[in-house]
């Protein structure tokens, strides 16, 4: 499982049926790979909930999202598992089947909520417009395999 965390001043996701937005917090781009499990979702959710990605008065990254009353916008992103080794068109065989991936994606979002976080989401498996107003920028990539952070 791969999650790109971007610290944002604001972010939104829209399509024909959806309009979700947050102010200060994280925009998460969430990729579910062939081998991704609920254990991977758990360890990444814990890391994100406790990650100190906001500055204190000395410009040190000392505050987590809860301490800043931030929110999360979680967007599924199967293209994080693109295979670009051959040719010019990416392949996506490393991404988990959508029927299985959506279950892990929803489990992951619920795991974040279990830490008391406000989580808004995109719509799994649809084309969306994602607007991200980065803060910093601060961008961290979390990867887990076999329930362990890589």
From Swiss-Prot:
Gene Ontology CC entries for this record: cytoplasm
Record's keyword annotation contains Lipid metabolism: no
EC number: 3.1.1.96
Coiled-coil boundaries: none
GO biological process: D-amino acid catabolic process
Keyword annotations of the record: Cytoplasm, Hydrolase, RNA-binding, tRNA-binding
Main localization of the protein described in the UniProt heading: cytoplasm
Superkingdom of the source species: Bacteria
UniProt GO molecular function: D-tyrosyl-tRNA(Tyr) deacylase activity; Gly-tRNA(Ala) deacylase activity; Ser(Gly)-tRNA(Ala) hydrolase activity; tRNA binding
Subcellular location per the Swiss-Prot or TrEMBL entry: Cytoplasm
Pfam families according to UniProt: Tyr_Deacylase
Record-linked InterPro entries: Daa-tRNA_deacyls_DTD (IPR003732), DTD-like_sf (IPR023509)
Catalysed transformations (reactions): glycyl-tRNA(Ala) + H2O = tRNA(Ala) + glycine + H(+); a D-aminoacyl-tRNA + H2O = a tRNA + a D-alpha-amino acid + H(+)
NCBIfam families in the cross-refs: D-aminoacyl-tRNA deacylase
PANTHER family: D-AMINOACYL-TRNA DEACYLASE 1, D-TYROSYL-TRNA TYR DEACYLASE
SUBUNIT field: Homodimer.
Name of protein: D-aminoacyl-tRNA deacylase
Protein's gene: dtd
